[in-house]
Amino acid sequence: MEQIIYTEKTDGISIDRIRRDAAFSMPRKHLHNEYEIYYLLEGERYYFIDRRTCHVTGGSLVFIDRNQIHQTSQAGPCSHERILISLDPSPFSEFLSSTGEMSLPGFFRCHSGVLTLDKEEQVRAECLLDDAAKELHEKKTGFRHMAMSNLSRLFILAQRHMSGSSLSPVLPLSTQPKHRKV
């Protein structure tokens, strides 16, 4: 069974949260022109990105660059819950780069892959994503700015985690051809 908790969209940004209680695997590898952030709240997945397959567990963020081949498939128990964000290059890229401290293409070029958050970061990430979706749903004055602000804070959270952590990002399970067939 699939339960859509929310699905929201505005110019250049879409965000949805889905819980699946049955086994689910994407039918095929794909790519698209949007940047993608996949946050696994609970469950286990295999995530194929380019030529590597990573084991992703609850509390992990997956950053997928534009036009990067990817696919997710079942690992472990059948159920999982995830939040998926798709970002067009515009308008979010301009918003994120407005201070000159970060750029969307630069972030994804350097940080494509899996990042496992600690418990405190997981709570913050989930709140930021849920709040962004709430802004897009309610459409109050300034909702786009608030949604993009929350997503910017998610990027900063991820960048600080990566720069301040002595832990390495999740390593691929394998780069062997037989494991590329997730």
Pin down the residues of each PLM region.
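A hydrophobic/aromatic-rich effector-binding and dimerization subdomain
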Residues: 2-15, 73-134, 157-165
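Short, charged/polar surface micro-motifs in flexible loops or helix N-caps
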Residues: 42-44, 61, 67-69, 78, ...
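Short, Lys/Arg-enriched, Trp-marked, Pro/Gly-tolerant hinge/linker segments that flank
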Residues: 111-120, 136-149, 156-182
